């Protein structure tokens, strides 16, 4: 057992050693490739920044610098150092002089203001002391105006007839009438007393035998009792397919996508914008120190360096493009005043004349022409109240006396009016006088027959009637048997039988419509960076001290300026 364990351990150790031997060269090659990529990226970055700085300096030289500040008066007394960086600016001018545009012409006059408030009333005028005679007019007559009488109205309708006069004198008596005819016969008298009953008849012969009768059907019988429970029903047929179900709920969010593939190698970036003043500093002397620095921080800073270089490249490309667009449209400012001592003292050989004499970090703004006339102004404020009016003059004008018009006493002659309406009916006249006595009446007609007389007395009772004949004997009847009655009403329903077996399950219904799509999954992990672009061409060599900081004395001049 121990030999087996030792053998297995030895084999595993040998496999591990072989794996390490194969892995170390691969790791070494990977580290070298990463190192080469970093060096290539730094080299490309350095070449691009050198090229951008050179182009920026060329553009800066073509632009006329702004007015130079006051020269230090002690420069002509004390000797300057040879390496004075006189070609560099003594201050940082990060913004050129802004153009001053003349104001546009004044706008048209505004709308007239609101009228001022009325002035205070003037002082009270002098009282008028002149007197006038009282004016009296004739009183107006209150009498009624007398007009002529109008025409009479039309005659009214005839009045109602008067009451009837009193009865006249009675006429002479007429002749006697003829005697009346005989009256109708009287009603018959009441029936007499009934006669005595007759003797009993002889018994009749025996009747014939009767036939067997058939009675009428009897009445329906009472409902019978409830029957026993029926047998269990047969199994039901399979049910029909169900209706399609409603749409299912939205699915859950999808799983995060896989990591994206590596991007295509980026194109070489364009030249970047110039940095701020003193942004470009000299590199340390010797390439060994830089190589040692990159080699020592390679495992830790490789990803950060590549990300920073990529972001910087994109930003510099965009900024440089915008600066070029602005630089083309810029009008250069006024050239600064020439130093009068340049012709007296010999200039240093290393003057850095190729560099600008100032740091112009912003393009010169264009000179603006006078703007168009402004819009009409706002309506003016309401005017101040006017001054009180002058004192009123006394009214010395005279007026003609007031005369009243004469009042006419004549009758107002009105035109004749239309005829009046018909008058009401007159009152009933008085009763007329008594009439004359009437003439004697004619002989009267015969009278009608008299009413029937009263019924006579009851008659004598009649004689007893004769005995009747004996009747025929009836036949003996047989006992009849009626027909069976109608069937009785159906009995109450028996108890329900046991439930039948369940039918076969119906087929599944159509599947419901697909639910809404789930939310998009989380974005996949970012793909690895693409291969670096091809290195750009070598840039132009920079001027001397192009990447050096301003000398310390620049701060003094900056404070004085």
Curated annotation (Swiss-Prot):
Record key words, sorted: Collagen, Cuticle, Disulfide bond, Repeat, Signal
InterPro entries, sorted: Col_cuticle_N (IPR002486)
Top-level division of the source organism's lineage: Eukaryota
Listed Pro residues bias regions: 100-112, 367-379
Compositional bias (Low complexity): 164-209, 219-265, 422-467, 486-532
Triple-helical region: annotated span: 102-127, 153-276, 413-544
Gene Ontology molecular function: any one: structural constituent of cuticle
Collagen-like domain span: 485-543
SMART domains hit by this protein: Col_cuticle_N
Span list, region Disordered: 100-134, 148-271, 367-398, 422-540
Signal peptide span: 1-30
GO cellular component: a single term: collagen trimer
PANTHER family, per the entry: COLLAGEN, CUTICLE COLLAGEN 10-RELATED
Protein function: Nematode cuticles are composed largely of collagen-like proteins. The cuticle functions both as an exoskeleton and as a barrier to protect the worm from its environment.
Subunit composition and interactions: Collagen polypeptide chains are complexed within the cuticle by disulfide bonds and other types of covalent cross-links.
Family to which the UniProt record says this protein belongs: Belongs to the cuticular collagen family.
Protein name stated in the entry: Putative cuticle collagen 145
Record organism: Caenorhabditis briggsae
């Amino acid at each position: 057992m121990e030999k087996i364990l030792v053998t297995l351990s030895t084999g595993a150790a040998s496999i591990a050693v072989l794996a390490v031997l194969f892995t170390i060269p691969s790791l070494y090659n990977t580290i070298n490739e990463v190192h080469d990529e970093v060096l290539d990226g730094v080299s490309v970055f350095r070449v691009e920044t050198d090229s951008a700085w050179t182009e920026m300096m060329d553009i800066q030289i073509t632009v006329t610098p702004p007015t130079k500040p006051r020269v230090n008066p002690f420069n002509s007394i004390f000797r300057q150092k040879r390496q004075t960086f006189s070609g560099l600016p003594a201050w940082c001018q990060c913004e050129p002089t802004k153009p001053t545009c003349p104001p546009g012409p004044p706008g048209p006059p505004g709308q007239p203001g609101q009228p001022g408030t009325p002035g205070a009333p003037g002082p009270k005028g002098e009282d008028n002391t002149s007197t006038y005679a009282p004016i009296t007019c004739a009183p107006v007559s209150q009498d009624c105006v007398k007009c002529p009488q109008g025409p009479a109205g039309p005659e009214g309708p005839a009045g109602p007839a008067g009451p009837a006069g009193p009865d006249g004198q009675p006429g002479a008596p007429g002749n006697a009438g003829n005697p009346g005819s005989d009256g109708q016969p009287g009603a018959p008298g009441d029936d007499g007393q009934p006669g005595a009953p007759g003797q009993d008849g002889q018994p009749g012969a025996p009747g014939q035998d009767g036939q067997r009768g058939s009675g009428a059907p009897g009445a329906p019988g009472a409902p019978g009792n409830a029957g026993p429970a029926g047998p269990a029903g047969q199994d039901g047929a399979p049910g029909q397919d169900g209706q399609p179900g409603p749409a299912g709920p939205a699915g859950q969010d999808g799983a995060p996508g896989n990591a994206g593939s590596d991007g295509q190698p980026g194109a070489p970036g364009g030249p970047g914008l110039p940095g701020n003043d003193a942004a470009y500093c000299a590199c340390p002397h010797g390439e060994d120190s830089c190589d040692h620095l990159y080699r020592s921080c390679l495992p830790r800073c490789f990803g950060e360096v590549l990300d920073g270089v990529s972001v910087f490249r994109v930003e510099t490309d965009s900024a440089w493009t915008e600066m070029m667009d602005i630089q083309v449209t810029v009008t250069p400012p006024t050239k600064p005043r020439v130093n009068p001592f340049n012709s007296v003292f010999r200039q240093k050989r290393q003057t850095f004349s190729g560099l600008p004499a100032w740091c112009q970090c912003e393009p010169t703004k264009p000179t603006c022409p006078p703007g168009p006339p402004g819009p009409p102004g706002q309506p003016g404020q309401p005017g101040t109240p006017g001054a009180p009016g002058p004192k009123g003059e006394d009214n010395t004008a005279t007026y003609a006396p007031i005369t009243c018009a004469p009042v006419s006493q004549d009758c107002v002659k009105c035109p004749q009016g239309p005829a009046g309406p018909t008058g009401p009916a007159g009152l009933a006249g008085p009763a007329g006088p008594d009439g004359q006595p009437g003439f004697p009446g004619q002989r009267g007609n015969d009278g009608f027959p008299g009413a029937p007389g009263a019924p006579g007395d009851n008659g004598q009772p009649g004689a007893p009637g004769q005995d009747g004949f004996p009747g025929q004997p009836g036949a003996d009847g047989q006992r009849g048997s009626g027909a069976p009655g109608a069937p009785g009403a159906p009995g109450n329903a028996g108890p329900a039988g046991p439930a039948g077996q369940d039918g076969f399950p119906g087929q599944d219904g159509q599947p419901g419509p697909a639910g809404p799509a789930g939310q998009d999954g989380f974005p996949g992990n970012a793909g690895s960076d693409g291969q670096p672009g091809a290195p750009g061409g070598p840039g132009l060599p920079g001027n001397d001290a192009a990447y050096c900081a301003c000398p310390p004395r620049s701060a003094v001049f900056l404070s004085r300026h």
